[in-house]
A protein has these predicted regions:
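Conserved glycine-rich cofactor-binding loop
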Residues: 6-7
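Conserved glycine-rich Rossmann-like NAD(P)H-binding loop of the short-chain dehydrogenase/reductase
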Residues: 22-37
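The beta1-alpha1 cofactor-binding region of Rossmann-like NAD(H)/NADP(H)-dependent oxidoreductases
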Residues: 49-60, 92
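Substrate-binding pocket helix/loop in short-chain dehydrogenase/reductase
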Residues: 86-87, 91-99
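Active-site helix of classical SDR
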Residues: 110, 146
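Residue(s) in the substrate-gating loop at a strand-loop-helix junction
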Residues: 130
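C-terminal helical subdomain
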Residues: 170, 186-221
């Protein structure tokens, strides 16, 4: 089951995984886009319109996927949005929406599938997080906070599920050409084509890795930022906004 499957990373994963023979429950709010993907994979998927912010809708969606396709072996929590704003112009409602979709939406998705996975003693939960989870970035307060929360949430879930047969994989990609990054004028370092990013994500899922970050060049820089003195990191980050 893939959330946020109508475009970007979610769509790319759906097409790739379906080509490998899997049956998919594709969730998003835009039915027409989901229907296009279902048509492209020739019946190996069903489209389910659902809003990840609605816990009951997510439970109903998971029930439908199980009824039509059988037990859910994997959840890919991909649904997410971003926002770009200096804190002085930040709209609290926009912040709430980002947190609601990126974090609570993932929690609702997990709650809809994990009890059955634990009962069966097998399954995999995958979170599509971001390198933005590691440290704050300029004009990205809501997005960075949501991805940091998402990564920590799934890390805690992984610890809770230790020994149950349910694995947890957290993906931390850098900049990828998707609708989320389209239209930005700022140069995004190591910007990846979607077709190059999808195999890396699928490989990590297949190997059931606990966590993966890519591209390695940008991941190395970001991790180095964790070791920098705060004054140094702030000086560098303030001069590099990727949200323009």
């Amino acid at each position: 089951m893939i959330t946020g499957a109508s475009s970007g990373i979610g769509k790319g994963l759906a097409l790739d995984i379906a080509a490998r023979g899997a049956k998919l429950g594709l969730l998003a709010r835009r039915q027409s886009l989901l229907d296009e993907i279902v048509g492209a994979v020739k019946g190996r998927a069903i489209a389910v319109t659902a809003d990840v912010r609605d816990s009951q809708a997510m439970k109903a969606a998971a029930d439908r996927v199980r009824e039509e396709l059988g037990p859910i072996d994997m959840l890919i929590a991909n649904a997410g949005i971003g926002t770009s704003s200096h804190v002085a112009q930040l709209d609290p409602d926009h912040v709430a929406n980002v947190i609601s979709i990126n974090v609570l939406g993932a929690a609702n998705s997990v709650a809809a599938v994990v009890p059955q996975m634990v009962e069966r003693g097998q399954g995999q939960l995958v979170a599509i997080s971001s390198l933005a989870a590691y440290r704050g970035l300029a004009k990205s307060a809501a997005y960075c906070a949501s991805k940091a929360a998402l990564s920590s949430y799934f890390e805690s879930v992984r610890i809770d599920l230790r020994g149950t047969g349910v694995d947890v994989t957290i993906i931390h990609p850098g900049f990828i050409k998707t609708p989320l990054t389209a239209g930005r004028e700022a140069k995004m370092p190591y910007l990846m084509e979607l077709d190059d990013a999808i195999p890396k994500i699928v490989s990590a899922i297949e190997k059931r890795k606990k966590s993966v970050a890519f591209p390695w060049q940008l991941a190395t820089v970001v991790r180095a930022g964790l070791l920098m003195p705060t004054f140094m990191y702030d000086w560098i980050a303030a001069r590099n906004s990727f949200r323009e």
